[in-house]
Design a protein with these regions (language model features):
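Non-transmembrane, aqueous-exposed alpha-helical and coiled segments at domain scale
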Residues: 1-445
Length: 445
């Protein structure tokens, strides 16, 4: 029996290998990408735009990155105001409603979020504490599906219900995330289970920090930094994997809980939202192996080892550098680095931040030197986001879940747009590479 099992495992790679030549023959847009790396146009959206290059007579020309939500620049939306408390909520309103809120409209949204923050009776005990998960993303995904059972109108497709469901999940996911973290620590690491009640009137970022920290204390600067991070991650176009996943399921006319749970599953992937863990692990290795973080030659030497597949995970990739769209700059990384610089100045984190800036500056030079090719690459938001979260004492296993809590607003906006304007189920085609075969009875095989 064991030999039979092994033969099944051995055949998996062989049976599922598609001849690479077939991708060229048909031709296939692998990963829904064109040959120049740009995405295949699969739809039109009024929600956001991600700009990273220009096209000149068919050639990609690098350009400074731009990110707009409903036509507004992310630089203007986030701004430089260090005292702003509800930037994320303002962006949530903009994404869902299409316009920037007035003061009274923003207050109404905040009240709606507060009203939905509590979980259904018994949910925490039966759905979180009694069934903890080693991975918070899995528990988030499971919880979204379980909230379906507590919604008597779960299959209703009215706009009122869609908006109500979206606001409910935007409000509840942060609470589920923090509870899932403590349930995990209690179940698998024998730590105390901490459950703070939320404080009405707090912003989303304040609520997260207040529920996460045992003493509930945080500074206005920390709350503002988390607010900025959530704003930067709230939306990033319709073509990213999790948002497209949400649109695909929405085009099939499934319920909102199923669509959002699928998006969370996509975001968990190491090639999407989970990529930040690779960045943090690589940065940790560099910090441990480079003695003088200010020595450019020593830092460049270790980056060269990574590029030449002699260090870290031996893939030759410098995680945190490069992006599918952005070429000269990622506006999210620019903003993140700017606010991180302010927060780290004069603290024990300043030297580490300077090292990250050095990695960002040296990486293109090292690649050119080692590979002989000049790449238009910039730091992406993951280069600095993990560092920012570490400054705030946010555990690493909460980074991708925080991403999900932030992106929930973007997923909802795209689901709304798909329901109104999509009209057709998303159904691309697949060519077959298998020729017709003659069926033989089992005794003749």
């Amino acid at each position: 029996m064991e030999d039979h099992k092994l033969s099944l495992y051995d055949n998996i790679a062989k049976v599922n290998a598609v001849d690479p030549e077939l991708y060229e023959r048909y031709p296939v847009k692998r990963g829904l990408r064109n040959s120049d790396g740009s995405g295949v146009i699969a739809g039109v959206t009024n929600i956001s735009n991600v700009h990273g290059y220009l096209m000149n007579e068919g050639d990609k020309v690098p350009d400074e990155g731009k990110l707009t939500f409903r036509g507004y620049s992310i630089y203007d939306l986030v701004g430089g105001d260090a005292t702003k408390r509800r930037g994320f909520e303002e962006i949530v309103y903009l994404l869902l409603m299409g316009e920037l809120p007035t003061s009274s409209q923003l207050d109404a949204l905040v009240e709606a979020l507060d009203a939905q923050r509590n979980l259904p009776d018994g949910f925490t005990a039966s759905k979180i504490m009694s069934t903890p998960s080693h991975n918070i993303m899995n528990l988030l995904q499971r919880s979204v599906l379980m909230l379906y059972a507590d919604d008597p109108k779960a299959e209703e497709r009215s706009f009122e219900h869609e908006i109500s469901t979206a606001i409910s999940l935007i409000s509840r996911l942060p609470r589920i995330m923090v509870l899932a973290h403590y349930a995990k620590r209690a179940a698998f690491y024998n730590e105390s289970m901490i459950m703070h009640r939320f404080i009405p009137g707090q912003s989303t970022s304040e609520t997260i920090l207040s529920m996460l920290r045992p003493n509930r204390e945080f500074t206005p600067e920390e709350a503002r930094m988390l607010d900025i991070m959530m704003s930067l991650h709230a939306e990033h176009g319709g073509g990213n994997n999790s948002t497209f996943t949400c649109r695909v399921l929405s085009s099939a006319d499934t319920d909102p809980y199923a669509a959002y749970a699928a998006a969370i599953g996509s975001l968990k992937g190491s090639k999407h939202g989970g990529a930040n863990h690779k960045v943090l692990a690589m940065q940790k290795e560099i910090k441990e192996n480079v003695k003088n973080w200010e020595d450019e030659d020593e830092v460049a030497s270790y980056i060269a080892k990574i590029v030449n597949k002699q260090a870290y995970d031996h893939t030759g990739l410098i995680y945190g550098m490069g992006h599918a769209v952005y070429t000269l700059s990622d506006p999210r990384a620019v903003i993140c680095k700017d606010f991180a610089t302010r927060l780290a100045k004069g603290t024990e984190f300043e030297a580490e931040l300077n090292l990250l800036k050095l990695i960002e500056r040296l990486s293109p030079e090292v690649i050119l030197q080692e590979k002989g090719t000049k790449k238009d690459m910039c730091a992406n938001v993951d280069m600095y986001s993990g560092f920012v979260y570490s400054m705030m004492g946010i555990p690493q296993d909460m980074i991708t879940p925080l991403f999900a809590c932030s992106r929930m607003a973007g997923w909802a906006a795209h689901r709304f747009e798909e329901l109104v304007s999509g009209k057709r189920i998303i159904r691309p085609a697949y060519k077959t590479g298998v020729k017709a075969r003659e069926y033989k009875p089992i005794e003749e095989r």
